[in-house]
Amino acid sequence: SQDTVFRIYSMTKPVTGVAMMILFEEGKWRLDDPVTRYVPEFKNLRVVKSISKDGKMELEDMKRPPTMREIMSHTAGFGYGLADEHPVDKMFREKEVLSSTSLKQMVDRVATIPLMFQPGTNWYYSASVDIQGYIVEKLSGQTLGQFMQNRIFAPLKMPDTAFFTGPEKANRLAAVYMFDRDLGKIVEAKQLFGVDMPDYTKPPAAESGGGGLVSTTMDYARFSQMLANGGELDGVRILSPATVELMGTNVIPKNVLVSNNGTGVASFNEAVGFGLDFQVATDA
C-alpha cells in the first residue's frame, strides 16, 4: 500500500548527495577540494599498483588525494565490500566497514585499506557516499539524520523517511526476501552481502549515507519530484536549479566510462555517465 515503508538501500545515495549540495551552496566545500581537507584520516592512503596471481597487492603512494568531485562520482578509488572479489573489497568485508558502530569508526577503518586505483583514473561503485555522510556531519554539526530531517524531509513533507521507523511504524515495514539456492525457494533475508540485516525499528549505530534510509513510495516521489522541478516542490526550495543541473551533469571522462561496477553485476556504456551521486544519461 502507499503506507508501506521500505528499506530503500542505495536510493539513499541521492538524498545524501542533496545534503552535500545544500552545504555546497552554503560555501562549506568546493568540488575540487581534496577530501583530506575534511577527512584528514585519509592523508596516508596507499594505492593498489598491481595484484599478483595469488591475490597479493603491490602498493604505491597516492599521486594526489581524491577530490570531493571524485568521492561524489565513485572515481576516488574506494572499495565497497559487496559482491566483488577484488582484494580491496575483501578487506572491506574483513574489517567490517559496513558494520561500523559509528561513522568515525567507518572512516578509520577505510583509512587502513588501500585505494583500488589512483584517484580519477577509473570508476568503481564504492563506500564514498557513506564517507559523504561523515562529511555532512562534520560540516553541519548535526547527525546525518538530523540534517536530512531539518533540511530535506521536513520541508518536503516526507514524514516516513528516516534511518529507522520507530516501534509505532514497525508493522508497516516491508520484509526483504531472497532466493535461497540450497532450499530452492524464496525466504526472508537475514543477511545482505554477508552483513546481518539491522533492526530498522531502532536507531542505527551508524547512519549510512550510502544505504540506510527507509521511506515510502509517496515520500520518495516527493523527493524525486523536487529534483525534477529543479530543486523546488510546493513552493519550498531545497536547491537552486543550477545546482540540480550540476548534479545531473556527467563528470566522468570518456576514458573511464566503461568500467566494472563494484557489485559485479553491471557496467557502463557510452550512453550513460555519472554525475554527483547518481547515474546520468549522456545521450538524452
Give the ranges of each region predicted by the language model.
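A short, well-structured edge-of-sheet supersecondary motif
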Residues: 1, 31, 277-280
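Residue-level detector of conserved, well-ordered beta-strand and adjacent loop positions
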Residues: 1, 36, 248
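Short gly/ser-rich anion-binding loops that grip negatively charged ligand groups
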Residues: 5, 10, 58-61
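Active-site SXXK
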Residues: 7-39, 129-137, 220-223
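Short, surface-exposed loop or secondary-structure junction motifs
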Residues: 40-284
